[in-house]
């Protein structure tokens, strides 16, 4: 499918919003501030991303993950039919971003190795597809649609008393309750981490990211002493996320090599066997360290 290219267009310069929330702020105001910051980050990185900058790609993916975390955090308060449509479009965009980012990570971990050239070629192809997507009308319709939804989507005008009440709840009340819920769910999901399969482990990693970002954008919205306790959880979450991320990167890299037949096991079975032993040992070490971190998160 060929994507229609969007002509050069003059983007609206949007004012910078305050970074932090306040305890008395209404939830609907806080939600708009958080989502606006995420979208501004996407816009800031767009030009560099379209030029192939790996750092801009990474920052764009973080901004979009934060955006999805915020929408999940506010949940029924903001979910509506328009978000369902926009979420589907975001999934389309994320597929291009993810394919290119996976190759960036694999290349970084393969410097000087024989497979580096193969990965560079695959990265060029993946980026061309990403750039075409970023220049398409479909992308800009999604991006402008997100701004419209944040400012005046169906969620903003629901008239039933419960919806209006939810939107008006102070940040300090809602965030304290919601963070506790998410923390409890993560503690439950992370039990038995060392014996988990990759799918369950992936869900722990996603839940970790969401809780991490939720804590980060709660700064200012909770009393200082309450936020201090979450800051300690945040420190462990970052470390746990790093370890699970390394495991994920290893698995992605292995899949890339397998799909491209990078390892000729018939010709060099000894080398392949040595590589598998090394991978199992590294995986065991990372899982052991991650399990210790998640026990601290649950304390």
Which residue ranges define each predicted feature?
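Function-determining surface determinants
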Residues: 1-299
